[in-house]
């Protein structure tokens, strides 16, 4: 007989404004504890020193995580010019310096090469796997890694401010798998002056915004209370980028069993991904074909 998972069957999203100095996994564990939830996960890792939106999926909402990780995200960050570090952020040992400082115009011109479809090499200290091991574990042991470049879509990358000659504040909107530390490193190299991330904040991720997130202090304060539970957003929030199709009663019953079910289509095209609802509740995600949704994920709500 299978072991029953302990905790409450809560499904939805809790948006956290992650503080610096805390790992994304630690935030998820705190949320799970505070809500006594059976299951939780996050939609996109933030570095420990980074702040901003961390969307925590609970229960059946974990099935919608891929739609958030695939969505566009926005980052604001400060690049420290003139210094290169082992980790490409302020926590690492300085390994190279330069007295050169680019002008605002030179920075603006260099940013053009980092927009659109680019190839990006992850930082040495990253969660990328190398022959089954995490890159950061190998890097800590002193190994210099030859990491392969990966494609990244950069929707926009703009200068927000130039506080002084040593710093430039940028804002980037990008797709899945982007490393802001790599942008800072590569920009510094392109400008001939080195660079690393001084600080980093994710301001939004898909439909979730940092300004709507709650602090870890609030989670501690409201732990195990109905007040915290009331802050959990509906599961459907994670499906905001997909069209919704109302299911017929018979269609909903079939979808819940994993079978194609009849839906009421509007302007959804054949072969398009969508999600079905019945009486206001998400039922399944799948592919629309000829009046039916063919489910790929079914929600047990």
From Swiss-Prot:
One GO biological process term is: tRNA pseudouridine synthesis
Active site feature: 47
Q: Pfam families, per this entry? A: TruB_C_2 (PF16198), TruB_N (PF01509)
For this UniProt record, the keywords arranged alphabetically read as follows:
Isomerase, tRNA processing
The record's section on InterPro entries has: PsdUridine_synth_cat_dom_sf (IPR020103), PsdUridine_synth_N (IPR002501), tRNA_psdUridine_synth_TruB (IPR014780), TruB_C (IPR032819)
Q: Which cysteines are joined by disulfide bonds?
A: none
Recorded catalytic reaction(s): these are:
uridine(55) in tRNA = pseudouridine(55) in tRNA
Q: Does the keyword Isomerase apply?
A: yes
**EC number(s) per UniProt?**
5.4.99.25
A molecular function (GO) held by this record is: tRNA pseudouridine(55) synthase activity
- Give the domain of life: Bacteria
What enzyme category does the UniProt record give?
isomerase
Q: Which family does it belong to?
A: Belongs to the pseudouridine synthase TruB family. Type 1 subfamily.
Function, in words: Responsible for synthesis of pseudouridine from uracil-55 in the psi GC loop of transfer RNAs.
Q: HAMAP family attached here?
A: TruB_bact
Name of the protein this chain belongs to: tRNA pseudouridine synthase B
